[in-house]
Amino acid sequence: MSAHGLPAPSRDDVLAMAQRPTSPSARRLAFYAAGIGLAVFVYALVVDPDRAWRAFHYNWYYFTAISSAGVTWAAVQRITTARWSRPVVRLMEGFVAFLPLAFVDLLLILFVGRSHIFPWTHTAPPNPERALYLNPTFLVARDIGLFLIIMGLGLWFVYNSLRLDIGVIPESGAAWAKGLRERMRRGFGDERREIHTTHSRNGVIAVFMVLFYAYGWSVLTWDFSLTLDMHFQSTLYGWWSFMTAWLGAILSISLLTMWFRNVMRADHLIVTKHFHDLGKLSFAFTAFWGYLTFGQYLVIWYGNMPEETHYMHLRLSAPWITITTIAAALAFLPFFGLMSKAAKVYLPTFIGFALSGLVGTYLQRYTEVYPSLYGIPKHAPLGVVEIGVGVLYLGTWGLCYLAFMAAFPKMRIVMQTSRYRDEIQVPVDPRTMEPLPAHE
């Protein structure tokens, strides 16, 4: 990825763009979606609580994994010291806004809805090892602990990033975060020193974010998806699942970048080359996701081990095969559609393929969860309840994200405008601020 060779904009110009408000209609739409979805969920709780909680669990799994992946994308930009993404990395950081609410939903799933979701709550595990792993106390403790670590690292990383901007700009933003912004300004020192300090601190945090994203979501995937079928096992399952979220995150980031470029009127900062880069990443991780999907299928199917093949056979049988086929086709379509540069930089085609990938991965999550819970029903339970709870999550995710963007600058300011912004490529002595000698 290149830095695109763009000249440094003025701080006043970037600040004006970063503080432009989003349309009130976007917040209203998210609010109405959340309200309608909540009504559907409450109605389903009364009529069919099993189906309601399973829809809640499935949508939590999809939206929370993508939110965690989105902020981890920002961590990767720090690890690689990327310059090309400086105008868009705040849009990645905004994904962290949903995680506190997702944690509350996690507690609801584990303490209120688990008997409606997980077979191991009312069926004995098939062997002592799985009984030990699925011990409720052990499972709840590790899931809550891992999620708190993942969320805490993400919030810490984004707090440091925001502080670097909040410390140099006048007070502005949503009233609910005024106290937090004031806290960020306390003790803010020399700009050059703050840049290096923040860069170094976030460099350490970013490494742990990536490690805990991979490990934490592997474990969460085992507990929230793999164990729904207590007789199935797969060593690739965790990788495959968290890479599904990784792909969904970069597709979501691409769509948000297109929208917020218009909101901020930042056409001269977020340029065609940014969409080319985002398109290349979307194409690459679609290919990698397809590789993992086919690789898992190939090994399981031709390995022909009964404890594994029944998982694939179920999803390739009626009534699930139709949804499985549609999910695979939609999720893999961006691989073919985004091969050319023209498709990446022409926004209507990019939007179409990004939406295709997101819907495909959404349905793929469905095929992860529902066949294990329902076996072979007459009809696949994909209706008003599942879609309604999906709308609930989409609306609440949108409200969290828009609240974050209303409270903080929508774009990194210091790292685009400071004359010291490129010094971070060279480590300095924290006491003297002089470059450290290079090691031959």
Q: Predicted segment positions?
A:
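Extended, compositionally biased non-globular segments
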Residues: S317-S372
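Membrane-interface transmembrane-helix boundary segments in multi-pass integral membrane proteins
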Residues: T235-S241, P306-A328, Y346, G375-F404
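Hydrophobic alpha-helical membrane-insertion segments
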Residues: V96-G113, A284-T293, G352-G360
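Hydrophobic cores of alpha-helical transmembrane segments in multi-pass inner/ER membrane proteins
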Residues: A65-A75, V104-L108, D143-L155, M243-M258, ...
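N-terminal regions that are enriched for targeting/export leaders
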Residues: S2-A69, R419-E440
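Juxtamembrane/interface segments at transmembrane-helix termini
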Residues: A44-W60, V76-V89, F157-I169, L228-M230, ...
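Transmembrane-helix bundle segments that line or gate the permeation/cavity pathway
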Residues: D48-R186, A206-M209
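Long, contiguous internal "core" modules enriched in hydrophobic/ aromatic residues
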Residues: P21-Y43, P136-A327, S340, S418, ...
